[in-house]
Amino acid sequence: MEKAILIRFGDLVLKGKNKPKFIGQIKKNIRSKLKNVNVEYTFQHDRIYVHFNEVDSDEVIKQLGYVSGIHSFSYIYKTTKDIESIAQLAKEVIQKEVKLPTTFKIETKRTDKNYPLKSLEISQKVASLVLPSFDGLKVEVRNPETVLDIELRSEGTYIYVGKIPALGGFPIGLGGKGLVMLSGGIDSPVAAHLMMKQGIDVELFHFESTPLTPLESVQKVIEIAKKLAYYTPYNKIKLHLVPFTKIHEAILSYVADPYIITIMRRMFYRLGEIYANQHGLDTLINGESVGQVASQTLSSIKVIENVTSIPILRPVITYDKNDIINISKKIDTYDISILPFNDCCSIYVPRNPVTKPTIDQALKEESRFEFKELLEDALKNVQTMIITPTTDFEIALHGFDVKDALSSYTQE
């Protein structure tokens, strides 16, 4: 029997006149993800059939699981429109795909309106031919454990059992570009993933304070980027490493203890906005969730984002921590994020961080040191890596800080 994968689109059905553009982008992204697998495609309106060798089945499903814009997919089998042929294929599919005993229902969709039988009649006829062959099948119309779907179309009949959930959302490439302020923690990788799922093409922006912080903290971010790269159409993602050490030292030296995190994050936002504007990125993205820490109260968020005018997206802003953790486990970043290596946000935590900062006091704290030249110097020395899922780079083996390590690595 002829086997393929049926791909169904997700939120694309909502896009009206823009729908062809979105479908074109998702076709492009699917082709890119499956370029190393021997497959063929059949494109029909709002669905895609992927034809493949059985030996590649697991790899095809794995790669499709990384493509945003797909709502679900199913293993699907094709035959003619002859009732006897449909019933015979249904038996073979049940033997192959269904675990018995189970309650059972056949649902038919008939798009070929010239076919002599109506949808319900097709279901009844096929059921009468199939059920005698299986002792473990019991008809249950209202709430069956198993549904056998029959789609009778002009070119033939398709049969499948069940749907494999996919990412949903929109295809990357049509939603603009964003700069993710990526720490080594749990939240920001999830924020990056959620934005990618919604079609945003992201780059990663990490503030590193080596040697104040260990190189292992940067290694964490590299490993997280490798996981996120799976969800891009071309299996690669840009990671920008921003040298924050001098700014960090100045903040620790001059800023009052309760305001250290507030001022540090204001510097993050300034750097992110300048870099985004210089490189054609439309928005900043972060992993802030209201009230989780002192710097994420509404008062703190208001004061911190006061230094920017660029849009700031916070996809996990209302998520519970457990919800964020569950997503991080699903995208395989959780075990990396909890590794015990401090970054610049966690290396020094004030005893009593301010939870209701004011803009006036923040400006007063910033007036204690000259930070503009420090920001300019940091931006001039950003180190950019192109990360893929197979990037093999142990940063601690190449130097004592990021600049030395990357310089040594590129010379090898």
Swiss-Prot record:
A GO term, aspect molecular function: ATP binding
Domain THUMP: 58-163
This protein's GO CC annotations: cytosol
GO biological process terms held by the UniProt record: thiamine biosynthetic process; thiamine diphosphate biosynthetic process; thiazole biosynthetic process; tRNA 4-thiouridine biosynthesis
Database matches in Gene3D superfamilies: 3.30.2130.30, HUPs
SUPFAM superfamilies to which the protein is assigned, alphabetical: Adenine nucleotide alpha hydrolases-like (SSF52402), THUMP domain-like (SSF143437)
Catalysed conversion reaction: [ThiI sulfur-carrier protein]-S-sulfanyl-L-cysteine + a uridine in tRNA + 2 reduced [2Fe-2S]-[ferredoxin] + ATP + H(+) = [ThiI sulfur-carrier protein]-L-cysteine + a 4-thiouridine in tRNA + 2 oxidized [2Fe-2S]-[ferredoxin] + AMP + diphosphate; [ThiS sulfur-carrier protein]-C-terminal Gly-Gly-AMP + S-sulfanyl-L-cysteinyl-[cysteine desulfurase] + AH2 = [ThiS sulfur-carrier protein]-C-terminal-Gly-aminoethanethioate + L-cysteinyl-[cysteine desulfurase] + A + AMP + 2 H(+)
InterPro entries: Rossmann-like_a/b/a_fold, ThiI_AANH, ThiI_fer, ThiI_N, THUMP_dom, THUMP_ThiI, tRNA_STrfase, tRNA_sulfurtransferase_ThiI
Annotated keywords: ATP-binding, Cytoplasm, Nucleotide-binding, RNA-binding, Thiamine biosynthesis, Transferase, tRNA-binding
Binding residues annotated for ATP, in chain numbering: M181, L182, H206, F207, R265, G287, Q296
Pathway participation: Cofactor biosynthesis; thiamine diphosphate biosynthesis
CDD domains on file: PPase_ThiI, THUMP_ThiI
Domain of life of the native organism: Bacteria
Protein location: Cytoplasm
Enzyme class: transferase
EC number: 2.8.1.4
NCBIfam families documented for this protein: tRNA uracil 4-sulfurtransferase ThiI
Its job: Catalyzes the ATP-dependent transfer of a sulfur to tRNA to produce 4-thiouridine in position 8 of tRNAs, which functions as a near-UV photosensor. Also catalyzes the transfer of sulfur to the sulfur carrier protein ThiS, forming ThiS-thiocarboxylate. This is a step in the synthesis of thiazole, in the thiamine biosynthesis pathway. The sulfur is donated as persulfide by IscS.
Family of this protein: Belongs to the ThiI family.
HAMAP family: ThiI (MF_00021)
Protein name per UniProt: Probable tRNA sulfurtransferase
Gene name for this UniProt entry: thiI
